[in-house]
Every structure is written in C-alpha cells, then in structure tokens.
C-alpha cells in the first residue's frame, strides 16, 4: 500500500494516551502522520467553534512517535481540524482519523461528541474520515483499537467509501482475545435522566454540575438495513461496532407524516 497522508485529532487533548497510540500505529505502517488536536480536555464540545477569542497553536512533536508532526491548539476539535486543513497542513490529507476517545461515542451521543465533530469536519471537506472510541472510561484497549482503526480505514479508503460518509468505530471494553467480530451497526437513540448537582461557591452563588445517566437505548426507526444491530447492542455483546454517518440530517419520510400547518389561510406544503 502506498503511504497515506493522515491527519489526526481528538477531543481528549494532546496528552491523551489514545491519540498518541493511534498516531504511533499509523506512523508504524509507513504513513505520513500529522496531529492537530486540542491542548487540553475538550470532551463533549460537539461541533462548537471559537469565534470570540484567538486560536493559538504550538508544535508538540516531542509528545509523539518519531516522524509524527504534531500541533497543540487552544481551540475545540472542530477548530483544530479547520486550522489544520486551511492553515497548518501543506497538502490535503487522504484520511482523517479522530480519537482514540477515552470513552464510548454511541447512538445519538455523537451529536455532542468532539471526537465525531473532528471527523465530521473532514467529511464536510470531502476527506474520508473515521472516528474511533474505546467504549469504557476505565478499560482502554488503545492498541487493539488503533490496530483495528488502521485495518478498517486502510481497506475502506481503497474500497467503496463515499466522500460524504463518516465511519464511527467503537471498541468494546474487553480483552482483544475475547472480542467478537466487527459488524456494521445503526445509531441507537439514547435517552438520559438529566440530573444537576447544585452547589454554592464561596460567595454564596449557585453553580451546577451536569450528571445525567443513560436510562434507555432505543432502536432507530430510519431508513437502512433492518437487520443491522444497534451500536449499543453490539458493544454489549463485546463486539466492535462500525456505524456509517452522513452530515445530511434532512428527514426523508412521507409528506403526510409531517404536522399539518396553515398560515394566513394557506396550507404549508
């Protein structure tokens, strides 16, 4: 295989073990690797951008494997990708990788994931992009996740991988030896019991910590292969999940399923 130009980011920051393992795995296969990632933890920032303050970037090659070019950026994961693609990287990447996230990115949680947002920036620019997450905060199979991410992306990029499709890979919290087979999956719909812990600062003013817990995982009902398991169900079976995601959120159901609206004596149709 000819070497690929690979751009890597994450939302856990430049010091995270996951991104360093992924970058090392890509470099070990002979690819040209550039890392542009946040200089600190930026989890759950979604696709947010920094517009009210400057974005700074500093070289961080010493934190990564030999041959990896790295930048630590003061912005969000989406900022990092934009800065990389339009300012820091000389040549357009062949592949964008985001991760390895310290924790799962399953179901509709992808909407708040900085890891998925970084990969989505690549997808929006017409670059094949894959997000990869270790589906546990304690058990982190980073090497196994990195190897699988590279196997999947190297094969997919030479296969039928549409430009507008992001691949979201989650690795189960188990040893590689007992891990089941990889399958294509659907996004589940995650429902939370949103809880806030209210406290007082030394001046008596209230502040809050968000501490929601998942209470339900529902099967999605959209178009697509009906025999695919949900990503959550796949992880519960100790099997890796691979979910295709596209940036087009447009609803494609029948017109009759939409709310009937009438404004100024005219029906909306």
From Swiss-Prot:
GO terms for cellular component: cytoplasm. Keywords: Cytoplasm, Hydrolase, Metal-binding, Nucleotide-binding. A divalent metal cation binds at residues 11-12, 43, 101. One of its GO terms (molecular function) is 5'-nucleotidase activity. Belongs to the SurE nucleotidase family. It comes from the Bacteria. It is found in: Cytoplasm. This is 5'-nucleotidase SurE. The keyword Transmembrane does not apply. Nucleotidase that shows phosphatase activity on nucleoside 5'-monophosphates. Binds 1 divalent metal cation per subunit. SUPFAM superfamilies: SurE-like. Its cofactor is a divalent metal cation. The gene is surE. It catalyses: a ribonucleoside 5'-phosphate + H2O = a ribonucleoside + phosphate. Its EC number is 3.1.3.5. Pfam families: SurE (PF01975).
